[in-house]
């Protein structure tokens, strides 16, 4: 009994972390088993890719319709399909598997930059989530979970390489770590360019701190493995275009990038809108603020919708939340920059083993803050932050790495616990900066844990509403299949989930808002639609297509033979050409 207790005590942090990861998995499995979140066309497209991989032996290199976003999520889902069959639940279980991998890798990074207790706190933050955060984790957009996985892997490997740079007994392992770094960088860039800040900054850190290892063969090894990770992209570029226009398979989905009409805003107005969209909408959404003061997307943006006292109060709260996080992030970067510069001088002058270990910790924390900070800056400069900051908040998913790192950084700079517990530092008094860091770490961790816990509970409370919407979609698919409407036209956000949920018995063509035809993300669907006469149209009930359908029917000389309303949500039109 004593031996068992000793074994448990010696591994208590690892056991607790495993329990936290298991709870994170269970919480997410519970959500997806209950049907939350429901599918959309991006999510369903990934499911179709996974089905084609598992059932047809296809090997897509990129997400259908996106020639810059890898297909790793589809392969993960195909693996789950092999055991559970093709379904929305199985698709999202593949995402949960990827997120669990991220949590494991992130723990490997956190224990290198802080204590195991604070690493556990960081894992607890990752286990929880507000509705928007969980939505981004459980929707198969492609590339976002991979950004977390490979970003955390790059940080963990770089931190270990810096820490072991002076240990001659680990030379072979360092070369293996460099190979792993190159492979993670290549696979990450293939999956999504959002990982680029992690690649660039960790590469710079390796060149700065690990030059004896990376020079010559180390660089060759890392670059070779990077190219290996990028090989799917290289193969795609080297492969001749298929007989059908490549655009049918890999062309980007047409999405608006700015207001359709109106006067052109000035440079100052544009910059202000970009910053406000990032600081008031995107950043709070990806850090849990939606729990404490919920808004709908239409209430949150644009600014014209800030008309009621409740909305104005929530926007004010979001301003405080976003501003506080930006200030704390800046504080963490300043503290770590100072720590890295000071400790590097000591290390170059023959510093102690402890100072070298402290250098690796501080460098790791700096990288874990700097890469998401670069992402925030680039996002703020993009049109997405001003035009649709709620939708594109997913671009800031690397904040899931920044938050635990920020807590570790603030806690590390508490007087005698500042980065580098040298004898000289242990005699320092707590300065104002250190007290600020201590208060920030404790208060921020408590607020975030409470907000994210409430967010997880609140997401479970939203299940009933989502299940009602899922039933409407099931009724629509059942109606189409039972009445033989297997070739239909619809709009983008309906098309692909209809195909997926009908097990490809219903194939659809996509119409733009001006009724022009949009090439499918998968060329075979265009061929199937072309073989059938256009007779069935399916649209959301209150949409531009439904509202203008009768006028379009007159213009195109159609006779509306049947109009069916499904659950007061969708309209199904069956038409025939008018007789000459």
Residue ranges and their predicted role:
Residues 2-4, 168, 197-227, 234, ...:
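Perimembrane helix-loop-helix junctions
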Residues 206-207, 289-358:
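Hydrophobic, aromatic-rich transmembrane alpha-helices
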Residues 93-114, 153-156, 331-334:
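Transmembrane-helix motifs of polytopic, lipid-linked glycan transferases
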Residues 31-41, 54-75, 81-89:
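Membrane-proximal lumenal/periplasmic loop motifs of glycosylation machinery
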Residues 172-193, 203-204, 225-230:
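Membrane-interface alpha helices of multi-pass inner-membrane proteins
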Residues 29-33, 74, 88-92, 99-102, ...:
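Aromatic- and kink-enriched transmembrane "portal" helix at the membrane-lumen/periplasm boundary
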Residues 316-327, 354-427, 435-438:
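Hydrophobic/aromatic-rich transmembrane helices and adjacent perimembrane loops
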Residues 18, 223-227, 351-356, 411-458:
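Signature aromatic-anchored transmembrane alpha helix within multi-pass, membrane-resident enzymes
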